[in-house]
Swiss-Prot record:
Main localization of the protein described in the UniProt heading: membrane
Location within or outside the cell: Cellular thylakoid membrane
Lineage: Bacteria, Bacillati, Cyanobacteriota, Cyanophyceae, Oscillatoriophycideae
Domain of life the protein comes from: Bacteria
Name of the protein in its database record: Cytochrome b559 subunit alpha
Stretches that traverse the bilayer: 21-35
């Protein structure tokens, strides 16, 4: 026979008013915080990814694909010109 762990049953937690008062505020705030993180551009700065308008320059409009795996340094320098 199994014993009890002393924790509250999940059904009691989900049906409590306190649970829904707390989570009705925190869950939407997580989505708002994520939206602000991305929409302000902070995500680009934190993770170091280029912004959508920085992928292509006026001089280079083709995809920067490396074709020769042994001369990658030279190819990257050509892409950065």
């Amino acid at each position: 026979m199994s014993g009890t762990t002393g924790e509250r049953p999940f059904s009691d937690i989900v049906t409590s008013i306190r649970y829904w008062v707390i989570h009705s505020i925190t869950i939407p705030m997580l989505f708002v915080a994520g939206w602000l993180f991305v929409s302000t551009g902070l995500a680009y700065d934190v993770f170091g990814t280029p912004r959508p308008d920085e992928y292509y320059t006026q001089e280079r409009l083709e995809l920067p694909i490396l074709k020769d795996r042994y001369n990658t340094d030279q190819q990257i320098q050509e892409f950065n010109k």
